[in-house]
Amino acid sequence: MRMKETLTEIFQNKIVDILLVAVILWIGVFIINRLVQLFFKRTDFIEEKKEKTIESLVRSVTQYTATIGFIFYVISLFVHDFGKILAGAGVAGIVIGFGAQSLIKDVLAGVFLIYERQLHKGDYVTVNNLFNGTVEEIGLRSLQIREWSGKLLTISNGEVRQIENYNIDFMRITESFLISFKEDPDRVYSVLEEACDMLNEELRDSLKRDEFGNPTEPFQIHGITALNKINRGVEFTVKGMVKDDDYFSASLAVRRVLVRQLYQNNVQMLEEAVRIERTQ
């Protein structure tokens, strides 16, 4: 009976220790993350996107470190000489013994992903030519992307093979459209030049500029990019370079202005007629 009471007392004391350590670790993680947030909020050393990326990384590192440390602590309470076993087996052997090769792969991939600055939190990306969305979280093991529909995707860093980033300094907008053979090319050029002038005025704050404040590549007619395309018409292309953050909104504005100008000047675009014959 006394032995049972002794074991119960020891077990209860360990439970108290476990809860105490869990609370301390939770508070420590919270304080570290909070300090990082306050530091970036009160300073302006780096860009906002990079600040959010670092915050995401610190949050991931502290959570993983606290969790692993807590697990080792709990095991050490119930396994005698766990520290000696850990030192003798080696950390690498224990990790492999737990079958965590995929974890190592994901963590290493995450480190290189962040170190090489392939993306930042808030960037719009395409991953592996399959997933499109805005980067919400960059962790040591996984990457979270929010699709336009609102769906949140979590991708293991080790599975990321290709990244297309739409938020690296600038983006070039190119719009191509087919005009009827019946239209005078010179008249089409004149209408498009007027449309480009309107775009450069309307989107002046979105244009990518050089160190002197001049537009790097204002909206202009790229030229006739195809003749007799698919036996239907002549292809004209308009292009311009904008800031990466304004790419999607600027693209919508470009299409709106071009369509409006072509319509107001009665420039005939292609129409596809479908002929249906009935047999008696």
UniProtKB/Swiss-Prot annotation:
Main location: membrane
Knockout mutant characteristics: Cells lacking this gene grow normally in minimal medium or in high-osmolarity environments, and exhibit the same survival capacity as the wild-type strain upon a drastic osmotic downshift. They sporulate and germinate normally.
Residue ranges of the TM segments: 15-35, 68-88, 94-114
A single GO cellular-component term on record: plasma membrane
Record-linked Pfam families: MS_channel_2nd
InterPro entries: LSM_dom_sf, MscS_beta-dom_sf, MscS_channel_2nd, MscS_channel_TM-2, YbiO_bact
Record keyword Nucleotide-binding present: no
Top-level taxon: Bacteria
Keywords (A to Z) from UniProt: Cell membrane, Membrane, Transmembrane, Transmembrane helix
Induction per the UniProt record: Induced by high salt concentrations.
Membrane topology: Multi-pass membrane protein
SUPFAM superfamilies: Mechanosensitive channel protein MscS (YggB), transmembrane region, Sm-like ribonucleoproteins
Localisation: Cell membrane
Protein's UniProt name: Uncharacterized MscS family protein YfkC
Organism: Bacillus subtilis (strain 168)
Gene: yfkC
